[in-house]
Design a protein with these regions (language model features):
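Carbohydrate transferase catalytic cores enriched for Leloir-type hexosyltransferases
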Residues: 1-392
């Protein structure tokens, strides 16, 4: 049977569906694709670890969940997963991270969210991890029929670092789920605060302890802001916590913040709107982001955002949030004081942020992604690169 005479098969790599960050992209994109009427023209095979099947919502009949337990960054994904893709006779494979297993004969679309691994190799655990990242990203960029990235900043990074032709790269912004746009009743904010033992008022940081998340400068700036104005606020540090937390815990103690810092760990998505909405401000002065989804989600919740004037954060939040140099502790502290003590400034940035968040839609991202699939399946030539709407 010819390819034209049967329903085309599209595979989506969802093995990182429960990962922090990229998991949100995978879950929301698949759910939004499933809602699109044009998706019913295809059969989808969604590859998910057996333990994570419940992370995806119930999908329509043209979606099949396939258990695939080969971990990322492993020999298994280059062998066992590769053989599975070959046997499944896919017409197109969407690599939602940056690994396109060898042997796969299907056309390929790859999403490269950012290239932090190669721009900041000091953030990787060892040189082997750096080598793997470089090799697999380069291979994916050569192999892919279409390349998706999530910001114009990431597109520029790909062009500058790897020499990729701009016309091969499609920028598709992440979306913001509907749960973040709802006006939450006070009772929901109170429920979340009680569940996690959050004192009021509080400032929120979300992101864990990876070096590029810049949590140490956030703590230093918070301590400086408290010294300057005796702020009544607590600082909530939400996100994954490593087994060995001694360095950050030692810094918290050295800054005399033990009584003012709350660490709830990973907060599930259903509680995030209440966590955001209960904060006086959201602090996200990270060193590098490919998009910065928590910034868009906080904006949608009507929370004023303090974030970085670097990487994609300038593109996503510039003009709509309080921007700072993430390496300047004094600047972060001044921003904290400004937002914590000035209700008018908070209201201004809350309104601006809500307007900006309206630009980010998972339904639009799904529509654009399906268009990329169709072009890749047709073998259509790359369209001229869209102009970057943000200045360099």
């Amino acid at each position: 049977m010819s390819r034209a005479a049967r329903t085309l098969r599209i595979g989506i790599d969802a093995r990182k569906v429960n990962d922090y960050g990229i998991g949100s992209y995978i879950r929301n994109l698949i759910e939004a694709i499933a809602r699109r009427p044009e998706a019913s023209h295809y059969l989808f095979r969604v590859y998910v670890p057996g333990a994570d099947r419940g992370a995806l919502p119930e999908l329509p009949p043209h979606f099949e969940i396939v258990e695939e337990d080969s971990p990322g960054y492993s020999i298994a994904e280059l062998t066992r997963f590769a053989w599975r893709l070959l046997r499944d006779r896919l017409d197109l494979f969407h690599a939602t991270h940056y690994v396109i297993p060898p042997l796969a004969r299907a056309r390929a679309v790859v999403t490269i969210h950012d290239i932090i691994h190669v721009l900041y190799p000091q953030f990787l655990p060892n040189r082997l991890a750096l080598l793997y990242a470089r090799v697999m990203i380069r291979r994916a960029l050569r192999r892919a029929d279409r390349i998706i990235t999530v910001s114009y900043n990431s597109k520029r990074d790909l062009v500058d670092y790897f020499g990729i032709g701009p016309s091969r790269i499609e920028v598709i912004y992440n979306g913001v789920a509907a749960r973040f746009r709802a006006d939450l009743p006070r009772a929901e904010r109170d429920r979340v605060a009680e569940k996690y033992g959050l004192p009021r008022p509080y400032l929120l940081f979300l992101g864990g302890e990876k070096p590029h998340k810049n949590v140490r400068n956030v703590l230093r700036a918070f301590a400086e802001a408290r010294r300057a104005r005796a702020l009544p606020h607590a600082l909530v540090l939400a996100g994954p916590m490593p087994k060995n937390r001694s360095r950050v815990e030692a810094l918290i103690a050295a800054l005399d913040l033990s009584a003012r810092v709350v660490r709830p760990g990973v907060v599930p998505e259903e509680d995030l709107p209440g966590l955001f909405a209960g904060a006086d401000a959201f602090l996200y002065p990270t060193l590098y982001e490919g998009f910065g989804l928590p910034v868009a989600e906080a904006m949608a919740c009507g929370v004023p955002v303090l974030t970085s004037s670097t990487s994609a954060l300038q593109e996503i939040a510039g003009g709509y949030a309080y921007l700072v140099d993430p390496m300047d502790v004094d600047a972060i502290a001044r921003g904290i004081v400004d937002l914590a003590t000035d209700p008018a400034r908070r209201a201004e940035f809350a309104d601006l942020g809500k307007r900006r968040a309206a630009d980010f839609s998972w339904d639009r991202a799904a529509e654009q992604t399906l268009r990329v699939y169709a072009e890749a399946l047709r073998g259509a030539p790359s369209r001229p690169a869209a102009p970057d709407p943000r200045p360099e």
